[in-house]
Amino acid sequence: MHVATDNGSIVGGAGAFQFDLTVPGGSVRTAGVTVVGVLPSHRRRGILREMMRAQLDDIQARGEPLAALWASEASIYRRYGYGLAALCGDMNIPRTHSDFVRPVERKGTVRIVGHDEALTVCPPVYDRVCAETPGMFARTREWWKSRVLDDPEWRRFGGGELSVAVLEDDGRPQAYALYRLNFSYEDGVPTGKVVVLEAMGAEPEAEIAVWRFLLDIDWMASIEAELLPLDHPLLLLAAEPGRLRFRVGDGIFVRLVDVGAALAARSYATDDDLVIGVVDTFCPWNDACFTVRGQKTMEEPDLRLPVDTLGSVYLGGFTFRQLARVGCVEEVSEGALDRADALFRSERAPWCPEIF
């Protein structure tokens, strides 16, 4: 934790904790940047810039190639090299319009479990999803206890208590859902809603089955969920996808603190190689040319881009060509955009299911 003081009083702070972030082909030790702020009385004095400078220097010294955060104001963090790396979506589904476009065979059985049992059965499912989804981060047992399954009154925002449903096949957990039932009635008619905090399936069939369970809960009028992946199966399964009211927003931002190490840590979809010229004025050790495999080079670049743009393509959430269209990438060598997009392609849309 970095803090700024004025005459002995704390006027600003910026925290970070370590986790392993999934990237295409593996995982990377990452600084999860959080609780960043400066008192209103001390704005416009360069305090945030100094804290970001000290924090990124420390992250580099600890050997963490990446930093990631959720941005309350994205324009602030772009100045320090963070790029939008993933999107997410919210849904608000009327239960009367939750039918699937085709029948889905229901596999397994669902059990409601207590939080102590959930601490045993849910993490293995999460870990399987995490291992194949860029943008997710590994959770420790303590994180599960204190952040995911802890359910004090202040976290409920007036809603119901945290419920946990586990879908099992031959006694083995294959999916789970964390949700709240917020009961309400108007003129004796149920108008409540299911608030889905997290739903994961180790296999596509299990994920679909646990969502079908959530959509079929009685006495509820709607199902709400936030922080969903852009490739969510309900977008293709819903008989009336417009009724999902799927709204897209920004997800995590990624900053390559050590460009060479970060590029070397992920895998690529082709055997091609090219040279990327990185512009990084805030972390000058990155201001250089790198091969896609992470080697610094004196060769002329095939592409030239600022480091925040590299953060946007790193997990596969955006393409070089998309960013070139808005002036964020310069194609130096003809055909380099297509080659880079083929290299950085990811099978899954990057997704982070939890704000930290």
Where are these regions (language model features)?
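Beta-sheet entry/capping signal
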Residues: 1, 8-13, 27-30, 65-68, ...
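N-terminal membrane-targeting/anchoring modules of bacterial envelope and secretion proteins
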Residues: 2, 10, 14, 36-37, ...
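An N-terminal, globular interaction/scaffold subdomain
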Residues: 14-17, 22-27, 39, 44-45
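Conserved acetyl-CoA-binding loop-helix of GNAT-fold acetyltransferases
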Residues: 33-38, 43-60, 203-215
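Conserved active-site alpha-helix within GNAT-family acetyltransferase domains
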Residues: 61-65, 70-91, 209, 230-245
